[in-house]
Amino acid sequence: MSRPSRLQRQVLSLYRELLRAGRGTPGAEARVRAEFRQHASLPRTDVLRIEYLYRRGRRQLQLLRSGHATAMGTFVRPRGPAEEPGDATAPGTRLDDGGAPKNSCEDTGARETRSDGR
């Protein structure tokens, strides 16, 4: 087996640091393990994605160490009865009766902001 690269050593170090930092925080260890397992199959050649995830992990480590974090978890959007796992519509949209995407803000009376901020 070849020697781990510098980036691999950094990722493993981050993993250990996150596990240590999350010891007293409910859900932290499970969240860290799940996140690392989810991305374990990334190809070694996808360096940009690995570096991005590494930087994101560093920021999460800073938050854990700051003492402001009381728990770690994930927000999962529950699937509605009409949604399929491979549904191509964007989050926050659903299909109207004609099959066209319908914005969920239309029913609530909330205004949808345009990309230019108006």
From Swiss-Prot:
User: Which Pfam families does this UniProt record tie to the protein?
Assistant: Complex1_LYR (PF05347)
Q: Does the keyword DNA repair apply?
A: no
* Top-level taxon of origin: Eukaryota
Its subcellular locations are: Mitochondrion matrix
Which biological process terms from the Gene Ontology are attached to this UniProt entry? mitochondrial respiratory chain complex II assembly
Q: Where is this region: Interaction with SDHB?
A: 53-65
Q: Where is this region: Disordered?
A: 68-118
Q: Where is this motif: LYR motif 1?
A: 14-16
InterPro entries recorded: Complex1_LYR_dom (IPR008011), Complex1_LYR_SDHAF1_LYRM8 (IPR045295), SDHAF1 (IPR052687)
Per UniProt, subunit arrangement is:
Interacts with SDHB within an SDHA-SDHB subcomplex. Also interacts with the iron-sulfur transfer complex formed by HSC20, HSPA9 and ISCU through direct binding to HSC20. Binding of SDHAF1 to SDHB precedes and is necessary for recruitment of the iron-sulfur transfer complex by SDHAF1.
* UniProt function note: Plays an essential role in the assembly of succinate dehydrogenase (SDH), an enzyme complex (also referred to as respiratory complex II) that is a component of both the tricarboxylic acid (TCA) cycle and the mitochondrial electron transport chain, and which couples the oxidation of succinate to fumarate with the reduction of ubiquinone (coenzyme Q) to ubiquinol. Promotes maturation of the iron-sulfur protein subunit Sdhb of the SDH catalytic dimer, protecting it from the deleterious effects of oxidants. May act together with SDHAF3.
According to UniProt, the name of this protein is Succinate dehydrogenase assembly factor 1, mitochondrial
